[in-house]
Amino acid sequence: MSIHEELRAELREAMRSKDQRRLAALRQVESEAAVVKTAPGFSEPVDDAFYQRVIAAYVKKMQKARDEYAALGPRAQAMAEGLAFEVEYLGRWLPKKLDEAATRALVRGIIAELGVTGAQAAGRVTGQVLKQHKDAVDGALVNRLVRDELAAPQP
């Protein structure tokens, strides 16, 4: 079953069970997909990879909003919890990301492969890691780890 078919089935089930949180998240994903599909110049196939990109972009926006609401304190707690639910719920359709330890190992391997040192090489290393492992790593985490590794004294 494709991701689109799963989303449609989940949407029907959420309607039947009157689960407003799931229903809102699924409708928003469909809306985001429709915006992308109707954009001028759109010509890619509407497949699982398309839906994963749409969901990933939406989840990224919701994570940022969740963090901003969480920083506002108790008044915005309900909104932050709602967004956290959406992020967790929609995450099941996204590829799994490597954890920090595995990402650090990749970063160290690329640094050794390129033979670079110093903070000025951070962009080159980050670009290489993302080029080779784009769907498996979190870009912000890679950037932080690259800067940490290049700033650390080399043995």
Where are these regions (language model features)?
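Charged, compositionally biased, marginally structured helical/coil segments
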Residues: M1-P155
